[in-house]
């Protein structure tokens, strides 16, 4: 089965009205436009998203829906550094330092809370800066991601030469 577009999200439906099968993804797999996965029930699916969301797949995104059957995305919990800022200045410092490392940064549950995937050097940096943090297991959902840049991404358009294009050698 080849999935080329998203159908919606489970939060917009009553999942009890459907038979839902899930594709379990790690947080870093949510930004893939082309991939192969197996659902929990063993169905092979290939994803080739034409208009992939800029932030990536989110928890509950529906990949397939037919009558009462749905295949949806489940983002697995992973080891995460939960960061709690004390002030706007500390928020700026956190965003600068995490961004400088090109690490993913996500909104947390409260106003000054953020999450980033666990890495020992990042944890050591936060400790050195005196930023309150703790390591927990939680989901890193793409819809909560602060950064949208995607290194080495392919353009979402085709380039073609004009019919009157000429190369002149002198």
From Swiss-Prot:
GO terms for molecular function: nickel cation binding; unfolded protein binding. One of its GO terms (biological process) is protein folding. Keywords: Chaperone, Cytoplasm, Nickel. Its main location: cytoplasm. It comes from the Bacteria. InterPro entries: UreE, UreE_C_dom, UreE_N, UreE_N_sf. One of its GO terms (cellular component) is cytoplasm. SUPFAM superfamilies: Urease metallochaperone UreE, C-terminal domain (SSF69737), Urease metallochaperone UreE, N-terminal domain (SSF69287). The keyword Cytoplasm applies. It is found in: Cytoplasm. SMART domains: UreE_N. Involved in urease metallocenter assembly. Binds nickel. Probably functions as a nickel donor during metallocenter assembly. Belongs to the UreE family. This is Urease accessory protein UreE. The gene is ureE.
